[in-house]
A protein has these predicted regions:
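C-terminal motif of bacterial Sec signal peptides marking the signal peptidase cleavage site
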Residues: 21-26
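Secondary-structure end/capping motifs
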Residues: 253-334
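Short, solvent-exposed loop/beta-turn-alpha elements that line the ligand-binding surface or hinge
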Residues: 74-81, 181, 233-237, 306-315
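Conserved C-terminal helix/tail region of periplasmic/extracytoplasmic solute-binding proteins
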Residues: 324-365
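Bacterial N-terminal signal peptides that target proteins for export
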Residues: 2-16
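Short, glycine-/small- and polar/acidic-enriched structural segments
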Residues: 35, 43-192, 208-211
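Pocket-lining segment of extracytoplasmic ligand-binding domains
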Residues: 184-187, 197-289
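Bacterial signal peptide processing site
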Residues: 28-31
């Protein structure tokens, strides 16, 4: 549950740039850019003064909040004369639209929007440069729902058409024997709304459930729901990518030192989260309050935090599986994957592993 406040943090976050919420399906091409390996061209960091960063009010994006609140972005990018300008999105498709429109340089996004950006641009628009989080998504339903059959004829929700939770929900429903189309019509209706609107609609009884990321799953539980499916239970070892970090390919080619400085800050944030989880939660809440005027209820936040594993491992195999799920439910064509050259070229972990090597850490494969 979220609480409202008029208090504003003056430490690191300023006014947000507004980005139009265009339909992802309308984006049939990217701004292009070279796809040469990172570090193969010289950077001109002096040519830019701002790194435009996109992320969500989701717990799986906590490394961004921690890096802002603890000053890691300011310190590491500041040595290059670059500052971070954050932009908040509800879900991945909107963030991908901003990447395509050259309105954002780097973004924390889920696997399915990453796949859509990669395939729609035929492998030209983006690169995955790091992981950020695993886990932290659940299907929470009303107390009178005890099985999938109880959902027939009812309406459930996900944050946005084609986003990671939307694919997971439709795939799971179809695997359980329901018939749900890509547009959400079928024996169970799947609608889309912002995470905060989902919590409100669930509380008023307009929704019977929702597949959402943390902390919204815990908010639904606090509103009287219970977990029908914890997505951790659907993946081997409970590991599956919920958030990766992607960069525009052109930005990576032109400014590899800026990207490396960004990744250094993100690695520092991950280390801080591991060592200081309580303060990291406070950083997330403070950052969220500064950006949105809302914060997560203190009774909810620790429970939500426990559902997430923060990691720089992009967990590639689970992204590939998520893409197969999207194909299965009609939200992606296999020919689009093939047309982009598969998923191996999507990943460029060169700079991440340089950062890890400096910290005496083994490379991420």
């Amino acid at each position: 549950m979220f609480s409202r406040s008029r208090r504003r943090r003056t430490t690191v976050l300023a006014a947000l740039a507004a980005v139009s919420a265009l339909a992802l399906a309308a984006c049939s091409s990217s701004s292009g850019g070279s796809t040469s390996p990172s570090g193969s061209s010289s950077s001109s960091a002096s040519e830019i003064t701002t790194l435009r960063l996109g992320f969500f009010p989701n717990l799986t994006h906590a490394p961004a909040y921690v890096a802002l609140q603890e000053g890691y972005f300011k310190d590491d990018l500041g040595t290059l004369g670059v500052k971070v300008a954050p932009t908040l999105f509800n879900a991945g498709p909107d963030a991908v639209t901003a990447l395509f429109a050259n309105a954002v340089d780097i973004a924390y996004v889920g696997p399915n929007p990453t796949v859509n950006a990669w395939t729609q641009s035929k492998g030209a628009a983006i690169k995955v440069i790091s992981g950020a989080a695993s886990g932290g998504a659940s299907f929470v339903v009303a107390k009178d729902i005890t099985s999938v059959k109880d959902l027939e004829g009812k309406t459930v929700a996900s944050p946005q058409l084609g986003n990671t939770q939307d694919v997971a929900l439709k795939y799971w429903l179809n695997k359980q024997g329901e018939q749900v189309a890509a547009d959400g019509t079928g024996s169970v209706t799947v609608t889309n709304a912002s995470n905060s609107d989902i919590v409100t609609a669930f509380g008023t009884g307009d929704l019977s459930g929702a597949w959402v990321p943390e902390p919204y799953a815990q908010s639904l539980i606090a509103a009287g729901g219970h977990v029908l499916v914890n997505e951790n239970d659907l993946w081997p070892g409970g590991k599956f990518v919920t958030t990766n970090i992607v960069v525009r390919s052109q930005f990576l080619d032109e400014h590899p030192d800026v990207v490396q400085a960004f990744l250094t800050a993100n690695e520092q944030a991950l280390a801080f989260i591991k060592k200081n989880p309580t303060q990291a939660q406070a950083d997330f809440n403070s950052g969220l309050l500064a950006l949105t005027g809302s914060s997560v209820d203190s009774a909810i936040l620790p429970k939500a935090w426990d559902q997430v594993t923060f990691t720089d491992d992009p967990l590639k195999a689970t992204l590939v599986a998520s893409a197969a799920h999207a194909v299965s439910v009609g939200l992606l064509e296999q020919s689009a994957i093939d047309g982009a050259g598969g998923f191996d070229p999507l990943y460029d972990l060169t700079l991440l592993n340089k950062v890890r090597a400096k910290a005496s850490l083994p490379p991420v494969q």
